[in-house]
Amino acid sequence: MGHLDLAALREEYARAGLDEADLAPDPIAMFDRWMGEAHDAIRHDANAMVLSTVGPDLAPSSRMLLLKGVAEDGFVFFTNTASLKGHELAANPRCSLLFPWHPLERQVRVDGVAAPLPRADVEAYFASRPRASQLGAWASHQSEVVSGRAELEAAYAAAEVRYPDQVPTPEEWGGYVVRPEVVEFWQGRTGRLHDRLRYRRTPGGWVTERLAP
């Protein structure tokens, strides 16, 4: 079986444009607008994002996560802090988020610094999760090598027995807010002359710039 001819795969982007006059006063307000439109158009996992981090050896790593909140100071997500991403953020809190909204021919890139959320916020979110997800957090020592799926299923069954009622928040379960320094909004256009409008934080506030595609 031959390889798919990836070089021949092309799409023409012609859904919409993005002008400077379309921008909100700040990137959080602009993101809220685009996220709402993405949710209306996509529904399924419109809040999915790629989180990229860098370890002490300067090797990058990326993974898909779900955005769980947008605050005045940034973008909120939750995860196991003992995972690879947790260790890398502890060593270097600078990170990047990418929201790929293919049906809208849009993407948003966020570069910023991750800061841990208060424990009360973490526990409040964990308490809102479905019981199955709570038990899964106890069963999985994220990013560690396991002997097979049976080991995970046994750990899950043990967690069910251990916590027949309320499931407490694991100590290593945490959350972060990514405080943005740069937020770029990308809209596909015809002829590959895409619109790229960037918010950049300065001591005097946010400035907006158009970038060549």
Swiss-Prot record:
FMN binds at residues 63-68, 78-79, 85, 107, 142-143, 186, 196. The keyword Flavoprotein applies. Binds 1 FMN per subunit. Belongs to the pyridoxamine 5'-phosphate oxidase family. SUPFAM superfamilies: FMN-binding split barrel. GO terms for biological process: pyridoxine biosynthetic process. Its cofactor is FMN. Gene3D superfamilies: Electron Transport, Fmn-binding Protein, Chain A (2.30.110.10). This is Pyridoxine/pyridoxamine 5'-phosphate oxidase. Homodimer. Signal peptide: none annotated. PROSITE patterns: PYRIDOX_OXIDASE. Pathway: Cofactor metabolism; pyridoxal 5'-phosphate salvage; pyridoxal 5'-phosphate from pyridoxamine 5'-phosphate: step 1/1; Cofactor metabolism; pyridoxal 5'-phosphate salvage; pyridoxal 5'-phosphate from pyridoxine 5'-phosphate: step 1/1. It comes from the Bacteria. GO terms for molecular function: FMN binding; pyridoxamine phosphate oxidase activity. InterPro entries: Pyridox_Oxase, Pyridox_Oxase_CS, Pyridox_Oxase_N, Pyridoxamine_oxidase_dimer_C, Split_barrel_FMN-bd. It catalyses: pyridoxamine 5'-phosphate + O2 + H2O = pyridoxal 5'-phosphate + H2O2 + NH4(+); pyridoxine 5'-phosphate + O2 = pyridoxal 5'-phosphate + H2O2. The keyword DNA damage does not apply. It holds the Pfam family PNP_phzG_C. Keywords: Flavoprotein, FMN, Oxidoreductase, Pyridoxine biosynthesis. It comes from Nocardioides sp. (strain ATCC BAA-499 / JS614). Substrate binds at residues 10-13, 68, 125, 129, 133, 192-194. It is an enzyme of class 1 (oxidoreductase). Disulfide bonds: none annotated. Its EC number is 1.4.3.5. Catalyzes the oxidation of either pyridoxine 5'-phosphate (PNP) or pyridoxamine 5'-phosphate (PMP) into pyridoxal 5'-phosphate (PLP).
